[in-house]
């Protein structure tokens, strides 16, 4: 999945597949997670957030199932 870099102290890059509602998040520690069932509005909110890390923790981290892919 193609990801775009973001300016964040915790998150390195973010990608989204609208056909499968899958959000992919790469952290600065090198780990990559895919979150399932994420609506496009949540992805857009994450990308546009003033603080990507805060938005991620408040709206995504504990709301969607995930797997570590790297």
Describe the role of every protein-language-model region.
Residues 1-70:
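Acidic/histidine-enriched, beta-strand-rich ligand/metal-binding domains
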């Amino acid at each position: 999945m193609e990801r775009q870099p973001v300016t964040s102290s915790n998150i390195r890059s973010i990608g989204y597949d609208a056909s499968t509602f899958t959000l992919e998040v790469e952290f600065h520690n090198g780990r990559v997670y895919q979150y399932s069932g994420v609506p496009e509005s949540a992805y857009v909110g994450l990308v546009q957030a003033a603080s990507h890390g805060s938005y991620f923790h408040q709206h995504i981290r504990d709301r969607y199932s995930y797997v570590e892919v790297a």
